[in-house]
């Protein structure tokens, strides 16, 4: 292997810097009725025209418009407490989430869904993560959202079915009453 790879750190996105316009808006505390340019992005990226996530969002017209049913916040950096926008560690943000999705194609274990349930946040994962397989074994069945962890069956050939299962689970969770959601949070923590 080349020595150049030994000196580099691989990161989720090629982050340039936190967005100053977003920082100013957040600091002002004022409600705004006009979106920022690139309203779904928290940090500027180097070579944004080559970023696969941004390309995907453009292809599917994901712009966080008022009538859009799906809103996206793309955070392309590690949440280490010093990112310039949130300035909170990942775990401090995780506890404020209602539901997490880790649609792993393959992870020997998959710590992120485990971390989610440890903080009482229900999650959706797949049977291709070790954690998903463990949950199924623990429950004696495929995990369902009402168990605190939904384990979606994933193969090399069922991407559409996986996407539909995730969509259906998120929609179902959004329809739960606060009492039902709280019960599911406790079940997630029990796992």
Report the location of each language-model feature.
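Long, low-complexity, polar/charged, intrinsically disordered or flexibly structured peripheral segments
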Residues: 24-85
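Intrinsically disordered, low-complexity cytosolic loops and termini enriched
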Residues: 8-23
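Short, small-residue-biased leader/transition segments that mark boundaries at the very start
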Residues: 1-5
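Generic recognition of flexible, low-complexity loop/linker segments
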Residues: 58-62, 88-90, 111-113, 137-140
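Catalytic binding pocket for nucleotide-activated donors in carbohydrate/polymer assembly enzymes
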Residues: 99, 103-186, 190
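Donor nucleotide-activated moiety binding/catalytic core segment of transferases
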Residues: 69-107
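Short, flexible/disordered intra-domain loops and linkers
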Residues: 6-11, 81-85
């Amino acid at each position: 292997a080349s020595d150049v790879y030994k000196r580099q750190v691989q990161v989720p996105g090629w982050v340039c810097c936190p967005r100053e316009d977003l920082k100013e808006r957040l600091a002002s505390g004022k409600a705004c009725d006009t979106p920022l340019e690139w309203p779904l992005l928290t940090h500027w990226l180097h070579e944004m025209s080559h970023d696969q996530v941004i390309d995907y969002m453009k292809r599917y017209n994901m712009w966080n418009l008022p009538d859009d049913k799906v809103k996206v916040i793309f955070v392309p950096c590690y949440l280490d407490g010093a990112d310039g926008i949130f300035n909170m560690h990942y775990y401090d943000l995780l506890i404020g989430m209602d539901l997490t999705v880790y649609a792993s194609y393959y992870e020997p274990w998959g710590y992120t869904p485990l971390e989610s349930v440890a903080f009482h946040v229900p999650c959706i994962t797949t049977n291709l993560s070790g954690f998903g397989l463990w949950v199924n074994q623990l429950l004696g069945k495929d995990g369902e959202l009402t168990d605190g962890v939904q384990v979606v069956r994933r193969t090399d050939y069922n991407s559409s079915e996986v996407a539909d299962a995730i969509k259906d689970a998120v929609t179902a969770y959004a329809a739960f009453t606060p009492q039902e959601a709280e019960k599911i949070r406790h079940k997630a923590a029990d796992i």
